[in-house]
């Protein structure tokens, strides 16, 4: 799937309705899906970040990953359009499957 334009609000709300752990966040340069995953230690958080990286590489579509002690935050959006694309919804759902 090639990013072309952002999804409408209806699709975003439907996704959040079925994936309530995810949030839609808005920054000046982007609208994105965000979720923070919690772990008991840094090693688990880092391992999870690496697994998300594997998904990203397979799709050639890369999120922002923020790694802290016991937490990994994943933000999906299409940089080219500065918004959420259908591929971001799929990859966010794929990210959930890692847990």
What annotation goes with each model-predicted range?
Residues 62-70:
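Amphipathic, hydrophobic secondary-structure cores in small proteins
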Residues 1-11:
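Single conserved hydrophobic/aromatic residue that forms the stacking wall/gate
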């Amino acid at each position: 799937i090639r990013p072309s334009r952002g999804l409408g609000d209806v699709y975003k709300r439907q996704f959040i309705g079925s994936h309530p752990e995810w949030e839609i966040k808005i920054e000046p340069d982007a609208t994105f899906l965000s979720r923070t995953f919690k772990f008991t230690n840094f090693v688990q958080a880092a391992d999870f970040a690496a697994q998300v990286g594997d998904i990203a590489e397979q799709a050639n579509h890369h999120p922002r990953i923020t790694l802290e002690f016991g937490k990994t935050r994943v933000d999906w959006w299409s940089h080219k359009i500065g918004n959420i694309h259908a591929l971001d919804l799929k990859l966010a759902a794929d990210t959930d499957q890692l847990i």
